[in-house]
Each structure stands twice: as C-alpha cells, then as structure tokens.
C-alpha cells in the first residue's frame, strides 16, 4: 500500500483490523501531571514528553483546550484522508469559543467558567477530493473526533485534594 500524506496506509489499515478483532486494543488511559512553574505557568508531563501551558509566551489553559480540539481534528482529517487515498495539500482547523471567568476568579453565584460555546472550521485544500470524500470527512469530524466527543458529552470525573 502507498504512502499518502506522509502516512503509510498499510499501518493505518493494519491497526484498524487489529481493533476490529479486539476492541480492547483501542482503549487508552493516559495520565498527565501538571506542575506549577510559578505565576500562571504549568509544566505538563506525560511519560517522556513535556509541554508548557500558561505563563509568558505560552497558550493559557483555555486556549490550549481549543488548540487540542483543533489539532485533534487536523489529525483526524489527515488520517482519514490518507485511508481513502486523498492527497492533502494543506489542512487547518480554526476553533474559537466563549467562556466567562467570573466563577474562576471567585465571584459567587456565577455560571461555570468553562466554554459555553465553541465553533470550528476545517479548511482543506485537496483539489482531487470528490463530494463523497468530503462528505465522509465531515462525518468523521462530527462523529469520530475524540476531543470533540469529549467536549460534547458529560464526562464522569473523580476528584481528590491532597
């Protein structure tokens, strides 16, 4: 199988076949640790990877939520375009949202401080795309985005404070 969009189709289809045979192979349970780095800065660790959120010159946590969502859909569209053999010249996702920080700064009896609205736009340059391929990619964005799905549902959360 060929390489499309710098990805090996064979690798993608092989993983898909593996998951079809055993759905537990699709399970993920990542744990990240955020460390305070002074002022409003955090250093995030996941295994041997590190990212910085907040502080001078970095995305703040709420911007990072949008960034993670946009990046997730870039990955999703690129992967599915590859699987259907569609060459992508360029791809970007623009995400924006509204939130209010009254509750975050400690004002009482105010609505939650999370996003209450998010909009996003996929900008795809794939001159050979058919209308069926575009419809398929739109469907994947609407139904298969892990972060989009997370944002759209009530997620069970547990909390400890030590």
Model feature map: region roles:
Residues 68-73:
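Alpha-helical metal-binding/catalytic segments enriched in His/Glu/Asp
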Residues 1-67, 79-162:
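Extended beta-strand/beta-hairpin segments
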């Amino acid at each position: 199988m060929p390489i499309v969009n710098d990805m090996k189709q064979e690798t993608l289809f092989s993983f898909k076949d593996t998951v079809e045979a055993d759905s537990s192979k699709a399970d993920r349970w990542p744990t990240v640790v955020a460390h305070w780095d002074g002022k409003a800065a955090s250093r995030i660790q996941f295994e041997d990877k590190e990212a910085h959120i907040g502080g001078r010159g970095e995305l703040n946590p709420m911007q990072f939520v949008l960034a993670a969502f946009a990046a997730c859909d870039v990955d999703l569209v690129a992967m599915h375009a590859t699987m259907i053999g569609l060459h992508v010249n360029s791809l970007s996702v623009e995400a924006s949202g509204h939130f209010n920080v009254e509750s975050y700064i400690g004002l009482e009896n105010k609505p939650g401080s999370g996003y209450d609205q998010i909009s996003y736009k996929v900008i795809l340059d794939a001159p050979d795309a058919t209308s069926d391929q575009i419809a398929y990619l739109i469907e994947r964005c609407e139904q298969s985005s892990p972060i989009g799905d997370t944002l759209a549902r009530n997620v069970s959360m547990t909390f400890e404070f030590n």
